[in-house]
Amino acid sequence: GELPLLERPFVLGHFDCWGLVLSYFRQTHGIELHDYRVDYPWWEDQYPDNFYQECWFECGFREFTGPPQPGDMVIMQVQANKWNHAGILLEGNMLLHHLYGHLSQRVPYGGYWQERTMKVLRYKSLC
């Protein structure tokens, strides 16, 4: 079976931020998203990949009007020149995410994370 969404160990290309988004949509909505995970630091400048910026639309996410709601995906840019991190908004303005080198966790969505947000998106069948 799958690991729980909280307190997963971080393993790049396996248990990482996109892996958590994949699991959230599979467990919560029965939606299978495309698996873009790779086991190298693709967000570093020497790599051409830019998965979040280039793939969100083809993966089924859409921009929306109105306020964000639980289940929306947040794409962030954290200590990189590319959009390199994602999480899921939860009830109570919480963010479910899995940061490099940390256990997956829920944190308040504001301040640091909100300032680094590039897009908030909703899966097309949930719009």
Predicted regions and their residues:
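Glycine- and charge-enriched low-complexity intrinsically disordered segments
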Residues: 107-127
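Surface-exposed patches in mature extracellular/periplasmic domains of secreted proteins
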Residues: 14, 32-37
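Residue-level signal for pocket-adjacent positions within structured domains
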Residues: 5, 102-104, 115
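Active-site-adjacent structural segments surrounding the nucleophilic cysteine of cysteine proteases
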Residues: 1-8
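Active-site nucleophilic cysteine motif
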Residues: 9-29
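Secondary-structure boundary/capping signal
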Residues: 29-33, 103
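...with weaker cross-activation on analogous glycine-rich loops/strands in unrelated enzymes
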Residues: 38-103, 126
